[in-house]
């Protein structure tokens, strides 16, 4: 347990130095306060145990559906009505509480539901999206492979048409929710035209096997898996009709990269808030840590970075609402915010001294979890190359 006087460490301070909250509509403010209350009242006191045990937090995940927080801004019947700003605020607050919950939401809504919403048939949307928004059903998104992460465009999983079905063979890795999913969006290369296409593989389909990847030091309370696909037979009606090339897959990923920027912001705010509270209460040499000049300088530097991250997120939400969010812009936001979050969390952990490595003091869990956010949906290196190609006109991938 946290030492006396620090039991509330991790609860929101409402850090907003530039008064950005004043821009929120009543609906956006409701999503913010609803998610914040859930995190402060239900998540913080139990999530450290789930994380330490590497146990999936089913009760908390179910609450996401009950509270109407799963939708990622999808304008589809059955999903809670929210704009991109509201979706970002939800992701920010969940990640402030825990990276595993933020990651679950990113997979469930940002990847699996979004792929079905963007590329699925009306029947597929009606069947899956409502139950997934309520978390009555769980989804997964299988793109990354054992030998293809950053170069997933070269994926080797294949699909061939055979009568009234498709037969899929291959392997996937680092697939969130894959061991518990009711439906998995699998991306595979059509052997006939060599284009990448999307398929819905349902729970219990013969030939589908998923095994949890153990020994993780990040986002431990959600499960990623290795998938083996051996002659997995998928009926024709389970192919996503709008997913006919890797570009269609990429359209889904644009939105998730902006979500990663919000996730990183949540982690950074958690670190800054904890460091500020701790610096005010912790006494050394007869006075609070915050009375030392060097500590104040570090806190102000952290606040400046958090505020810049907030401004990034506000702008990408505005662009997304207007239908103008470019892949390069989302990539730059992810690159910037994940990089800054890592720096802020390292500072926060250091300011907490020895207590900074204890789970009850919150920061070390966020410091570990930001490593996953920094890596998935396109590493910093890949985002740099994407933006670099855009501003110079020269590709430097190889």
Residue ranges with predicted function:
Residues 2-21, 89-90, 111, 352-398:
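Glycine-rich phosphate/cofactor-binding loops in nucleotide/flavin-utilizing enzymes
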Residues 20-24, 209-307, 373, 382, ...:
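Glycine-rich beta->alpha junctions and the first turn(s) of the following alpha-helix
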Residues 47-52, 280-287, 303-336, 349-357:
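C-terminal helix-coil-helix/basic helical segment that borders enzyme active sites and/or dimer interfaces
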Residues 132-135, 265, 269-272, 299-309, ...:
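Alpha-helical transition-metal enzyme core signature, strongest for iron centers
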Residues 135-143:
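A short, Trp-centered hydrophobic/proline-enriched beta-strand micro-motif
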Residues 157-160:
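A structural signal for short hydrophobic beta-strand segments in well-ordered beta-sheet cores
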Residues 169-210:
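A short core secondary-structure module
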